[in-house]
């Protein structure tokens, strides 16, 4: 019931504040509620809704085939790697659900290590996985990490990036994904333990062990080194999925040496290392090859899922340029469309861009740099030119840096001419 004082003044039925003490008093059948109580109720309902929604999201895990189907929209090729990642991620979040529901069987973490050359799609795969699952995602560089007490970053700073990605929602961060790039750079310098301290190699591997396995870590909220007079954020890493990626240059020789020992004698087929496909060799990788490369046994044991990626050939690079939702050609066409200009790439031009990337050995990562070189002048000139209808990138534009061809539309007549004034002008009938 509503409350009244002696002067019959209206009061909130919940907190007892008078009409003068609050901004707004909402009346109902025999009851009143103030704006402050409404706000408090809204916060309580929102918190409960967030918890329910988080549980629903966690339970609604896409099937491995559905995960791969979405990965196919953004990442070209690497089918085996996508299948392995889809299964590993699906099993990881099923494991979290089993912990929520309670189970007799304890499921171990399925952290992942990805091996593949530069520009083969390791980082993009990890980013796309996080987007599919709608979980916080952070990328860390293993080369910046050092052992505690030395100049560099502590391993706990990796967790801080994930917490920041989750807007400091610790519960949400504890179900996120962390991608550690350049993991091969923290391999110890030799297979045998050394007397000298390896603070950026084996020391970092030792420091990462507990986080990978699952522990309650203390993270400095501002980053940097720990000191005793600061507060820490506590985060449980048990349900965080770690994906470690690296090029692992030279590991194919270790694999070849191991396989080669089994094929000795007069009848053995000897294949030149140059002719051998690195991607095919990596398919034969075993944990012992990672040990030989310089990862410590305990570290390899915490990365049970090994995923290999192969170098991208010309056909794959052409598809990357044109097919995915975020394809570079589509992005540039959209930019030109904003200036009301049609951008067209000839088939031979796209193939020439792919050939340049292979020649530079940069993989898909180098495609953007090549396109920027080609498109710089035309993106500078065209916005200032009037009546430009179409811009055509040719093979010569890519290989010889010949200016692209533009079609000018004046008085319903299209005139095709190269951008430079010395080139010939060809009149075309209006379509």
UniProtKB/Swiss-Prot annotation:
Positions bound to Zn(2+): 12, 15, 34, 37
ClpX-type ZB domain segment(s): 1-53
PROSITE patterns in alphabetical order: CLPX_ZB (PS51902)
Pfam families: AAA_2 (PF07724), ClpB_D2-small (PF10431), zf-C4_ClpX (PF06689)
Residues annotated for ATP binding in this entry: 117-124
Record InterPro entries: AAA+_ATPase, ATP-dep_Clp_protease_ClpX, ATPase_AAA_core, Clp_ATPase_C, Clp_protease_ATP-bd_su_ClpX, ClpX_bact, P-loop_NTPase, Znf_CppX_C4
Keyword Cell membrane part of the UniProt annotation: no
Biological process according to GO: cell division; proteolysis involved in protein catabolic process
Entry annotated with the keyword rRNA-binding: no
Keywords, comma-separated and alphabetical: ATP-binding, Chaperone, Metal-binding, Nucleotide-binding, Zinc
GO cellular component terms listed in the entry, alphabetical order: HslUV protease complex
Molecular functions per Gene Ontology: ATP binding; ATP hydrolysis activity; ATP-dependent protein folding chaperone; protein dimerization activity; unfolded protein binding; zinc ion binding
Oligomer and partners: Component of the ClpX-ClpP complex. Forms a hexameric ring that, in the presence of ATP, binds to fourteen ClpP subunits assembled into a disk-like structure with a central cavity, resembling the structure of eukaryotic proteasomes.
Family: Belongs to the ClpX chaperone family.
Described function: ATP-dependent specificity component of the Clp protease. It directs the protease to specific substrates. Can perform chaperone functions in the absence of ClpP.
Protein name from the UniProt record: ATP-dependent Clp protease ATP-binding subunit ClpX
Species: Acetivibrio thermocellus (strain ATCC 27405 / DSM 1237 / JCM 9322 / NBRC 103400 / NCIMB 10682 / NRRL B-4536 / VPI 7372)
Gene: clpX
